[in-house]
Swiss-Prot record:
It comes from Neisseria meningitidis. Residues 122-159 are annotated as: LID. It comes from the Bacteria. SUPFAM superfamilies: P-loop containing nucleoside triphosphate hydrolases. Catalyzes the reversible transfer of the terminal phosphate group between ATP and AMP. Plays an important role in cellular energy homeostasis and in adenine nucleotide metabolism. Keywords: ATP-binding, Cytoplasm, Kinase, Nucleotide biosynthesis, Nucleotide-binding, Transferase. It catalyses: AMP + ATP = 2 ADP. AMP binds at residues 31, 36, 57-59, 85-88, 92, 156, 167. ATP binds at residues 10-15, 123, 132-133, 200. This is Adenylate kinase. Its EC number is 2.7.4.3. One of its GO terms (molecular function) is ATP binding.
Amino acid sequence: MKALLLGAPGAGKGTQAQFITAAFGIPQISTGDMLRAAIKAGTPLGLEAKKIIDEGGLVRDDIIIGMVKERIAQDDCKNGFLFDGFPRTLAQAEAMVEAGVDLDAVVEIDVPDSVIVDRMSGRRVHLASGRTYHVTYNPPKVEGKDDVTGEDLIQRDDDKEETVKKRLAVYHEQTEVLVDFYSKLEGEHAPKYIKVDGTQPVEAVKAEVLGALGK
């Protein structure tokens, strides 16, 4: 099973990724992990990427695609892989097809923006322990205070409504192009496109995703 998982920040993609990788015995591949591994291993592509990152630049697509090809040639990918957050752009998706990296399925966890804003902007965190609360779904016993220590809870910058809305706008801009690209592919290159309602309970989303993937 060679699949790509799409979902906005806060859509519950990470949870579903764990279910998919466990069900099919395949690794989850993210560009961040791949870059770190290549840099640590000191591969030629890793060294080139490190130089660009150290200079504050963005790693070029040709380096990323090269790393992807190296990564999916490894033994643990013989039954397939799950791409998470890659490809991000139309150029990357096109380069993947040109490089002969085909996908069996593209899975999108679909959650309305209003639900995601509510999920993320309601998060509160106790920094010292990492304990996380939600003002609606998992509130602390005392508003704004950690249950264990009584210390203040904070709202991370990433979870502020304006930030969440900006991230969603970027996600839609990128993803709509990808969805359009994959849905128009024909013949052997065409993956199955699966859109799942991510507002359902976690187990229901899991059942629908795995069912659509043939498990």
